[in-house]
Structure formats: C-alpha cells, structure tokens
C-alpha cells in the first residue's frame, strides 16, 4: 500500500499533495502503523491514507510545545499570583481574569502528554491517554471561550453603568461557577461515550472529539458542540462589546453637547477622566484577548466542520496540527496582553518584579493626586 501511494505521489507530482510529508526512513509505513492491533479502532481510516510523519517533525513539535508550556506557565502563574494577592486588584471583575488564567493553565497540562507522545511517535496510554488529553483540552477550550463572554459582559456593565452596574463578589462567583458548568456537558459526554467520543487526530499524538465518523449521530454532535462552544460565546462577546462601544460613544456625545451649551471645554473632572481612561484601557485588554480567541479557535472550528460536513481531502495531518498549535498559542499570549496594557497589573508588576522593566504609574495614585491638586486650587480673588 505504501509503495502504491509513493508511486502515485511521484506520478501526479508534489502539487497534488502539498502538505503530505514523506521521509525515507518512514516511507514504508502509514499513519497508525505503530499502534497495537487491539487499539487500531482508535485511528479513523482517513488517517491511514497518509504516510507516517518523520520523527524529526515530531521532535520539532515537541520543542514548540515545550516553549509554549514554559511561556504559559510563567505568564499565567504570574497573573494568578498578582491578581489573587494584590489588594488593588482584588475585585469582582478581576476574578474573571484569574478564572481565564486557570483555564489557560489547564490547557498547558496537556503539554507534557503531547511532548511524551511526540518522542514515542504515538499515543502513550492509548484510549486512556487520549481521553485525559482531550478532557483537559475540552474543559479549558470551552471554559475559556465562555469566560471571554463573561468578561465582555462585565466590561459592558462596568463602563456603561459605573455606579449601579458593577458586579459584586457573589455574582462573580456564580458566573465563574457557570463557566465551569458550561464546559462540562461536551467534556463528560464524549469522555464516557454517552454521546460522541475522543479519538486521535493529525500526527496521532493529539486527541479531540470524533468529527470523521460518517453517521447522523456524529454529525449532530459536531454541529451542537460547534454552536455551544464557538457560536454562542462568539455571539455574546460581539453583542456585549458592540453595546459597550455604543455606550461609550453616547456618553461622550452627551458630555460634549452639554459642555457646548454651558460654554465650557469639558464637564468631566480630571479624576473622572482618569478613572474612565483606566476602565477603557482594561476594556481594550479584554477586546484584544477576544480577538486572539477568534484567531486561535476559528481555524480549528473550520477543521472540525470540514471533517464532518466538507471536503475531507483538505485535512492532511499537518493541516490539522497547525490549528491545534494556534489554540495553545493563545493561552500563552493572554497573560502577556495584560502585562502590556492593564494599568493596575502593570503597576503591581513594577512593584513586585522590577527586573522585568515595566514602567507604569499607579492609576489610583494618579487619581488621588489629581483630586487633591484640584481641590487645593483656589482661583484668584477678583479685584475690588
């Protein structure tokens, strides 16, 4: 079979299979050749049409994931440490930031498994190893998606209704519990074979839910998880951010019109301006993370929908591994987005880890100084 495939490849030419990799030392094997007979049902027939990937590609992938793991553990670890121990950051809104960092760290727990699989060039633990890997990925991926939606809701409430719209600690705790419950159904159901199942994909060193089996049950499962874990969070995020930006524009327009009527430059005090500026910067951080979420998960959503309903010939091993890497990259970038843009987080970083070279003035100190200066200023008395 391998000889016929190689001969066909040479006859048709390299352009017909641009993403299929053949190495001399594995040309006689096809994907799944090193999985024992009793576990062969794990591998879908689609993957058996591709030659086994060179061991060097496995090593490159292991190196990439090692770097991602170190970056994510460092960044998310610092986020959880600073947000959970800093008095200035101990707010209901920042509980969602910690929750997102926990989901990101959970995704990184997959990395040791994948690195080990890459060196063995197969799944270690077979079905059990596949289930553990996929459960971690499902919980963290779906949980992170809905947490982004909750953060968008919180930013909208905080900025559009700063006096009575802020979420309190109890409400934040309930919303965090909701994110975990939201991630459970499509993690538990395939893990226990109640609906769907977890199977290897790509290089057969990673696992996800089955989107290749040709039956109605699998197709309905793929459609439902697509709506549940991608479409609904995306719709909520888009709605809340559109409402947020609309509220900001309306507020600015009202202030400008009122100031024009009163023949003054601005109705907002310096303290209000500073406070609002901080909140808007935080909203920009949240929106940036949402954008990263789209970049990370849209390619993988395309892969799964193509596998279930589209042209499967597009899904070569490397074509499915690239979106999988993108999903892991975003969990590494999230904490550094906060380091770049979140004013109070940057101020705490400067205090605790000065060697990182962060330069940020404490927003609360700026507001206090501005208020004192404004209160202490007295206009000169009019001459008699």
Swiss-Prot record:
What membrane topology is annotated for this entry?
A: Multi-pass membrane protein
Which PROSITE patterns does this UniProt record tie to the protein? G_PROTEIN_RECEP_F1_1, G_PROTEIN_RECEP_F1_2
Annotated Gene Ontology cellular components are: membrane
Q: Which GO terms describe its molecular function?
A: G protein-coupled receptor activity; photoreceptor activity
The UniProt keywords, alphabetically, are: Chromophore, Disulfide bond, G-protein coupled receptor, Glycoprotein, Membrane, Photoreceptor protein, Receptor, Retinal protein, Sensory transduction, Transducer, Transmembrane, Transmembrane helix, Vision
One annotated GO biological process:
phototransduction
Q: Does the keyword RNA-binding apply?
A: no
Question: Where do the record's glycosylation annotations fall on this chain?
Answer: 4
Residue ranges in the Cytoplasmic topological domain are 84-94, 154-171, 241-284, 334-384
Q: Which residues lie on this side of the membrane: Extracellular?
A: 1-62, 116-132, 193-219, 306-312
Membrane spanning residue stretches: 63-83, 95-115, 133-153, 172-192, 220-240, 285-305, 313-333
What tissues is it present in? In the retina, expression is essentially uniformly distributed but a higher level is seen in the ventral region where the B-cells are localized.
| InterPro entries listed in its UniProt record | GPCR_opsins, GPCR_Rhodpsn, GPCR_Rhodpsn_7TM, Opsin
Q: Where in the cell is it found?
A: Membrane
Give any Pfam family that matches: 7tm_1
Q: Which cysteines are joined by disulfide bonds?
A: 130-207
Its job: Visual pigments are the light-absorbing molecules that mediate vision. They consist of an apoprotein, opsin, covalently linked to cis-retinal. May play a role in photoperiodic photoreception.
Family membership noted in the UniProt record:
Belongs to the G-protein coupled receptor 1 family. Opsin subfamily.
Q: What is this protein called?
A: Opsin-3
Q: What is the lineage of its organism?
A: Eukaryota, Metazoa, Ecdysozoa, Arthropoda, Hexapoda
């Amino acid at each position: 079979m391998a000889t016929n495939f190689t001969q066909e490849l040479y006859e048709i030419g390299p352009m017909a299979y641009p993403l299929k990799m053949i190495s001399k030392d594995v040309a006689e094997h096809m994907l799944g050749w090193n999985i024992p007979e009793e576990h062969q049902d794990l591998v879908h027939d689609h993957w058996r049409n591709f030659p086994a990937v060179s061991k060097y590609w496995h090593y490159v992938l292991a190196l990439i994931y090692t770097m991602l793991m170190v970056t994510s553990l460092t960044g998310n670890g610092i986020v959880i440490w600073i947000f959970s121990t800093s008095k200035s950051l101990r707010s209901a809104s920042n509980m969602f930031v910690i929750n997102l960092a926990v989901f990101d760290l959970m995704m990184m727990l997959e990395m040791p498994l994948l690195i080990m699989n890459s060196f063995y060039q197969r799944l270690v633990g077979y079905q059990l190893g596949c289930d553990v890997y996929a459960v971690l990925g499902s919980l963290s991926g779906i949980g992170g998606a809905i947490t982004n939606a909750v953060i968008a809701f919180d930013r909208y409430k905080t900025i559009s209704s700063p006096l009575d719209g802020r979420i309190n600690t109890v409400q934040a705790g309930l919303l965090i519990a909701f994110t975990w419950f939201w991630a459970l159904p499509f993690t538990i159901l395939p893990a226990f074979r109640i609906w769907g199942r977890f199977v290897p994909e790509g290089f057969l060193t990673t696992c996800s839910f089955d989107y290749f089996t040709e039956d109605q049950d699998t197709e309905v499962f793929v459609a439902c998880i697509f709506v549940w874990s991608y479409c609904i969070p995306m719709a909520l995020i888009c709605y809340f951010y559109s409402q947020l930006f609309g509220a900001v524009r309306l507020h600015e327009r009202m202030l400008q019109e009122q100031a024009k009527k009163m023949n003054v430059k601005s109705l907002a005090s310096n303290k209000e301006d500073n406070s609002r500026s901080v909140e808007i910067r935080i909203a920009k951080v949240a929106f940036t993370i949402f954008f990263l979420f789209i970049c990370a998960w849209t390619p993988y959503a395309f892969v799964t929908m193509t596998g279930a309903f589209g042209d499967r010939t597009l899904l070569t091993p490397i074509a499915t591994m690239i979106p999988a890497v993108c999903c892991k990259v975003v969990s590494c970038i999230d904490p550094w987005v906060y380091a770049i843009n979140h004013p109070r987080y940057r101020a705490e970083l400067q205090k605790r880890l000065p060697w990182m070279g962060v330069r940020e003035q404490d927003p609360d100190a700026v507001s206090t100084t501005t208020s004192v200066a404004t209160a202490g200023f007295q206009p000169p008395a009019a001459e008699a």
